[in-house]
From Swiss-Prot:
<dbReference type="GO" id="GO:0003924">
    <property type="term" value="F:GTPase activity"/>
</dbReference>
<keyword id="KW-0158">Chromosome</keyword>
<dbReference type="GO" id="GO:0033677">
    <property type="term" value="F:DNA/RNA helicase activity"/>
</dbReference>
<dbReference type="GO" id="GO:0005697">
    <property type="term" value="C:telomerase holoenzyme complex"/>
</dbReference>
<comment type="subunit">
    <text>Component of the telomerase complex.</text>
</comment>
<dbReference type="InterPro" id="IPR019437">
    <property type="entry name" value="TPP1/Est3"/>
</dbReference>
<keyword id="KW-0779">Telomere</keyword>
<dbReference type="GO" id="GO:0000781">
    <property type="term" value="C:chromosome, telomeric region"/>
</dbReference>
<comment type="function">
    <text>Component of the telomerase complex involved in telomere replication. Stimulates RNA/DNA heteroduplex unwinding which favors the telomere replication by the telomerase.</text>
</comment>
<dbReference type="Pfam" id="PF10341">
    <property type="entry name" value="TPP1"/>
</dbReference>
<comment type="similarity">
    <text>Belongs to the EST3 family.</text>
</comment>
<keyword id="KW-0539">Nucleus</keyword>
<protein>
    <recommendedName>
        <fullName>Telomere replication protein EST3</fullName>
    </recommendedName>
</protein>
<dbReference type="GO" id="GO:0007004">
    <property type="term" value="P:telomere maintenance via telomerase"/>
</dbReference>
<dbReference type="GO" id="GO:0042162">
    <property type="term" value="F:telomeric DNA binding"/>
</dbReference>
Amino acid sequence: MPKVVLASRAHKADSIFLREWLVDAVVPALERSGACAPWAGVECFIPALPPATATLSLEPTVIQNPKRFLRIVRFTRVHDFAVCAVARDAGCCILVEFTPHCVSNFERRYHQRITSSTVNSLFVIGNTSLLFYARSDAAAAFEVPALMNGSSTLPVLRVGDCAIFDQDQVESHRRFPLVQEHPRFVQSLDMAMQGSVLSRYT
């Protein structure tokens, strides 16, 4: 008799630490940036990680903050020692740039490339800025041509520090939209752009 795999056990469940937070954090940041400059961003969007220790997974400041967690979906480009990727929370994806400093520290800590066997792994991040890229700049920087067909402004996380929280490579067959495709982001960006146009005539 063929072996039957129950649907509930066909795929590993996602981590309980990975929650939906990107939209709730990015949209208010866009709204606060002002009508005249919706691309201003937030320099200290996520604070630095505590000093690396063997008990990082037990650090309260890490596990109690949902904004610390992202799962790597894919890497898109390595350029000038910076590594570009797409990562996600439990609901949406976002473009991520790991700085050269971040990449160097990661590779010294784990003795491996940041791109080696880490796709679908759960990362914790810190020292992270939120940037807003123009569509053409994002498509070029991340080498994702499909970005040219979407929003005129794209949120990007520039990560200055990261660590592996769980290296189990949990792959989901669900489609996770990019943050800029979410209705709340689209609405907030439209309002910001309308305010920018009006401000030129007042």
